[in-house]
Regions:
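Anionic N-terminal interaction surfaces
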Residues: 1-60
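Terminal and domain-flanking low-complexity segments
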Residues: 119-159
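Generic intrinsically disordered, low-complexity segments enriched for polar/acidic and small residues
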Residues: 26, 37, 53, 68, ...
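Positively charged, low-complexity terminal tracts
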Residues: 2-10, 16-26, 73, 81, ...
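Phosphoinositide-binding peripheral membrane targeting modules
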Residues: 39-118, 124-126
Length: 159
């Protein structure tokens, strides 16, 4: 019982090792226990959704080297929706950072031809204007691994 409560209290926090990595890289901003709204419309082998909306708790952080966000699906607190350098500009996903938080939009067919539709993740956390000015970029494109899409859609990935 105590293990469950301890693990439950850790949901949404940035893992300590990730926080240490960001600090070593020159942390700009971190946010833990952030409300994340996932919009999923499309098909991933094992699930089809016309317009599914789910709420989660995650975290994100910015360092001088990269942007990273966690998406704890099915108890995996280390699952990352984004973890890439600021100069990344290729891939089926787009991250946008505004004063309202971090938004990620994924073109599922671009991740894997077996997928269709889109997935949007909205990390709702106010980001001060002075922090936005310090960021190397407020929009970028990046690659997404199919295993992330499976996990975020609630499907056990195929080996």
């Amino acid at each position: 019982m105590f293990g469950f409560l301890r693990n439950w209290s850790e949901i949404g926090k940035l893992p300590p090792e990730l926080r240490e990595e960001l600090e070593a890289e020159g942390v700009i901003f971190t946010a833990g226990k952030v409300g994340v709204v996932r919009h999923f419309s499309g098909h991933v082998p094992g699930v089809h959704s016309a317009s599914g909306v789910s709420r989660y708790t995650g975290g994100f952080g910015f360092s001088t080297a990269r942007v990273v966000a966690t998406f704890p699906a099915r108890g995996d607190a280390k699952l990352r929706s984004i973890d890439c350098p600021w100069d990344t500009d290729q891939g089926p996903a787009r991250a946008t950072i505004t004063d309202k938080g971090l938004q990620i939009e994924i073109d599922l067919h671009g991740v894997d031809p077996a997928f269709s539709g889109s997935m949007k993740l909205n990390y709702k956390k106010a980001i001060p204007g002075d922090i936005l000015e310090k960021l190397p970029a407020t929009a970028l494109r990046f690659r997404v691994e199919p295993v992330f899409v499976y996990r975020a859609a609630g499907v056990r990935p195929k080996p």
